[in-house]
Amino acid sequence: MVKELATETNILAIESSCDETAAAIVSDGTRVRANIIASQIAVHRRFGGVVPEIASRHHMENIVPVVSEALATAGLAFSDVDAVAVTYGPGLVGALLVGVAYAKSLAYALGKPLIGVHHLLGHIYAGFLAYPGLPLPAVSLVVSGGHTNLVYLEDHTTRRILGSTRDDAAGEAFDKVARVLGLPYPGGPELEKLAREGNPRAIPFPRAWLEENSLDFSFSGLKSAVINYLHHARQVGQEVNRADVAASFQAAVAEVLVTKTLLAATSYRARSILLAGGVAANSVLRRELRSAGEQAGLPVFFPPRELCTDNAAMIGCAAYYQYLRRDFAPLSLNAIPDLPLN
């Protein structure tokens, strides 16, 4: 049972699963009083992707000033914090350990509850920050660099994974195709920008539907088809319209994601659809999913773009619902890089 609280609950949330060191203060699961992010994009760009060891070292440098800035922005002291929340998986183990170790130390020093939050659950709850009254049950499409999942949310305590990727995640495919197109890191936003100049119907790249009514995903074949198309064109000296390649690839990914999400939502009689994760910032995916939802009579919700990428506000929102049911973590909490959503 969810317990009603008479006073405002302030949660200090920490996120360090990949290459952003983030801290936020979230009150009552809806009011973001501070959301501070120290990004490492510029650091990793020259390597074409995140270097785990470098990411961990920068988290160690950033964690204290980021938390201090979050408290200052919120106008709060440590004594005003009711609980400390932290992402403990999935993610890069070294990066996760920095956030988890700091959060455990802080919770112990303050004598406050520690709340361990699943990173993907945080992405889902970014939607509840923007839409606290989002109708449940809902189907959430979670799309990021490392994950692609369809999740059924019956309420704030019960969820079920309906489908997952069998190989590459959608965001991973975006990044790899962007790389072969010669686009800078991070590839997803750059590919979307290039695709605006192209024809999404120019190249009939394959769509992997898998078995009939399957809610799983597969993007490795599509990724390989794009790479093979580019390699063949270069071998025969054929000029390649990179914008058409980007647009056609993006259209193929969006079509599969949208079709399977609508199938899940209608099959499980969801009252709404929630888009979440870094790829949720993609304009084509947003437009196509909203259009499909309208045709099916289902409202579609997605967070503002600043809450789609990794941040601590989403962790604070998810943690609030765990706080209500006293779902606290022991001080022995450890980082779990392959933490399952179930």
UniProtKB/Swiss-Prot annotation:
Entry's cofactor comment: Binds 1 Fe(2+) ion per subunit.
Residues recorded as binding Fe cation, renumbered to this chain, are: H119, H123, D310
Binding of substrate, residues? V142, V143, S144, G145, G146, D175, G188, N282
Q: Which GO terms describe its biological process?
A: tRNA threonylcarbamoyladenosine modification
Give me the Gene Ontology terms describing cellular component.
cytoplasm
Q: Where in the cell is it found?
A: Cytoplasm
Key words of the record: Acyltransferase, Cytoplasm, Iron, Metal-binding, Transferase, tRNA processing
- Could you say which enzyme class this protein belongs to? transferase
Question: What terms describe the molecular function in GO for this protein?
Answer: iron ion binding; N(6)-L-threonylcarbamoyladenine synthase activity
Q: What is this protein called?
A: tRNA N6-adenosine threonylcarbamoyltransferase
Q: Which organism is it from?
A: Moorella thermoacetica (strain ATCC 39073 / JCM 9320)
